[in-house]
Amino acid sequence: ALPRGEYQLSQHVGGRCVYTFCMCPGGSVVAAASETGRAVTNGMSLHARDGENANAAVVVSVNEADFGGDARRAIAFQRELEARAYAAGGGGYAAPAENVRSFLEGAGTLYAGAVKPTYPRGVTACDLGSLLPGELTGALRAGLSAFERKLRGYTAPEAVLTGLETRTSSPVRLPRDENGESTDVRGVWPCG
């Protein structure tokens, strides 16, 4: 079994942060939609972590100005992105996907290479940047380029982006002891 992923990458781009989340060695990208007509991805590894690929979410922070400032608008914004992903996947819950280099160039291509998408419902080539507001796309492109400078090969031609993962948790860490209990608040066992 492979150990837990040891890297976390982050880059500040303007007023946003782009970061990797939940690196899964030997992992898969899986379907996580909970509503009809929406596509959502997530990543996971089985216990043995012996899958063909490794995967990590690449997340860009969303500001209140992106969605209009209140919780209802934030949820509507998320649902709109998920509906766009569903449509871009061609319906049937396939996910839109693109090679990383293609995303950086705005080309919208996906070719068969060393990295084979694991998404169980299938993938459809798509310009992922067209699914997001321009500010988010620009930040993701800048962040991925910075990640390549930090970790050579991160934007390798065969690397694949499968999306959209719209339901990440905040990058807050809750310290726990060896039994999983919070070290800050006794009697609380954070999970998730």
What is the predicted function of each stretch?
Residues 1-192:
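Residues forming the flavin
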